Amino acid sequence: MNDVIIRQLAHLIPYQPLWEAMQTFTARRQSQTTDEIWFLEHEPVFTQGLAGKPEHILNSGNIPLIRTDRGGQVTYHGPGQLMMYLLLDLNRLGLSTRTFVRTIENTVAESLQEWGIPAQGKETAPGVYVDDKKICSIGLRVRKGFSYHGLALNVAMDLTPFSCINPCGFKGLMMTQIQDYVNPIEMDAVKRTIIPLFLKNFGYNQPAIMVETSLEFLIDDHLRSFSEKLGERETVTNSRQN
């Protein structure tokens, strides 16, 4: 079994520098680099995937639009949405891209079912749905067997900006969130549910290496090696997820 580092970022994180940090991590990682999962919430932003078509952006208003290198069409990120960026070595995990996506979907659905939400994936479209409403979007990039980008799980957020786009390229697609079924709901409670399931379903050692990290620390990947940074300006705790 393999170790994984789970980094948790506080505050609302701007998209562009976080995306650049993911790219840098992926470009510089080697076969022995430990996999990482980054948990955070973004400042309001629309992101357009590589397959994105302009007609799916109905009215972005004053919310920034960033064209990225992930798969998929346009989606929205904002406060109250849990982002999980999956920086994994798929070859080491023995996963094809298709199996990787299905494992993500099944893990998210399993975590939502623990809250009594009847969530499931769809064969025809990536993501996790409750009936015909989408609750979790998935957009990935795999380079030389290394994945980055990840998933966006709607927890307790303002869903209004989704009406300004055709979410994931589907006209009229309705979005939903955990808060619509479990109210009140806390972000930390969602993390406590989903983390152990990810560790189990992807075959990682438990407990995970839990790290409180700042955006500035991640940006330093442009200048310093992982080994030089380890243990600096961050608090590392090996805590079991219950």
From Swiss-Prot:
Its EC number(s): 2.3.1.181
GO CC aspect terms: cytoplasm
InterPro entries cross-referenced by the UniProt entry: aa-tRNA-synth_II/BPL/LPL, BPL_LPL_catalytic, Octanoyltransferase, Octanoyltransferase_CS
Pfam family, one: LplA-B_cat
Catalyses which reaction(s): octanoyl-[ACP] + L-lysyl-[protein] = N(6)-octanoyl-L-lysyl-[protein] + holo-[ACP] + H(+)
Active site per the UniProt annotation: C168
Organism superkingdom: Bacteria
GO molecular function: lipoyl(octanoyl) transferase activity
Keyword Plastid attributed: no
Function: Catalyzes the transfer of endogenously produced octanoic acid from octanoyl-acyl-carrier-protein onto the lipoyl domains of lipoate-dependent enzymes. Lipoyl-ACP can also act as a substrate although octanoyl-ACP is likely to be the physiological substrate.
Protein name per UniProt: Octanoyltransferase
Organism expressing this protein natively: Coxiella burnetii (strain Dugway 5J108-111)
